Amino acid sequence: FPAEGKRPYPLVLYLLSSGGYGSWYDGEWIKWFNRQGFAILWVDQYTARGMSLDGGLGTKQSGMSDASYVSDVYAAIRTAKADPRIDPERIVTFGMSWGGGVQMYLMSQWWEEQLGGDDVTIAGHIALGPACYLTVEKPVPTTGKMLMLLGEKDNWNQPKPCRNYAKRLQQAGASITVETVKGANHAWDFNKAAKSYRAVVYHCDIRFDPKTMDARNVEDGIKVNFSRDGWGKVWDKCVRKAKVTTGGTKKQLNWTRERVRKHLADTLGM
């Protein structure tokens, strides 16, 4: 909880990336949100599943499903809304990479109906360099206002599928702002020198129809029916190991924090 301010507090629901928790990164963002007057609830999707909190999914990017993470987030939202210290009308999510990608599901009413249950609507979302590899073809959006920040040179989570999904959400009536951080790699807000290494990437733009469960990979044209065929071959060509680059500058971090601060002010009237 923040050192100053009045109850009930606005809340940032902090969503970890696939890299797990790092005090040098996640801890600093949490302190920053506290200084802005926000209570923080961060979701640890790893420990209870016997996974390393520090290591997350690792470079193999495996061990836990998106649906499991989304279910955890909805549970956290319900918990926060039931706490009298928290203002249920002023809750936002924040996450980078996988933590941002999970928010793509939160923007869809279909996922909310499948995994969320009652009373999980919140005020907004902030996604940095999100993963947008699996989306609803024709989404019916939820009401939260989203800020999506994309790295111009992100070679881990490609910006294009996110722009495509954001456009479809906007056409369906969603309140979503998309901005590109010039020259930015993946995780540009690390405030660490850029470095490259190999990791599993999901360079996919897979869209599905919830009514029929027909899905297609937009990039290579592969089509499947999830109910009949399973999920396998639609992913075959777009999930692979590749060179990724992470890191950025203090200037990029400062710009990002100011943009996040403005979105919070606009969304919550603070």
Where in this protein do the model-derived segments appear?
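Short beta-strand-to-loop junctions in surface cap/lid or active-site-entrance loops
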Residues: 1-7
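Serine-hydrolase catalytic machinery in alpha/beta-hydrolase-like enzymes
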Residues: 11-82, 241-242
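Primarily recognizes the serine-hydrolase "nucleophile elbow" in alpha/beta-hydrolase
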Residues: 21-25, 65-142, 155, 160
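Residues at the C-terminal ends
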Residues: 34-35, 141, 171
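Short aromatic-enriched loop/helix-cap "lid" or pocket-rim segments at secondary-structure transitions
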Residues: 53-55, 139, 189-195
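Short beta-strand/loop motif that positions the catalytic acidic residue
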Residues: 148-150
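Conserved loop-alpha-helix segment in the C-terminal half of the alpha/beta-hydrolase fold
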Residues: 162-173
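C-terminal catalytic histidine-bearing segment of alpha/beta-hydrolase fold enzymes
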Residues: 175-270
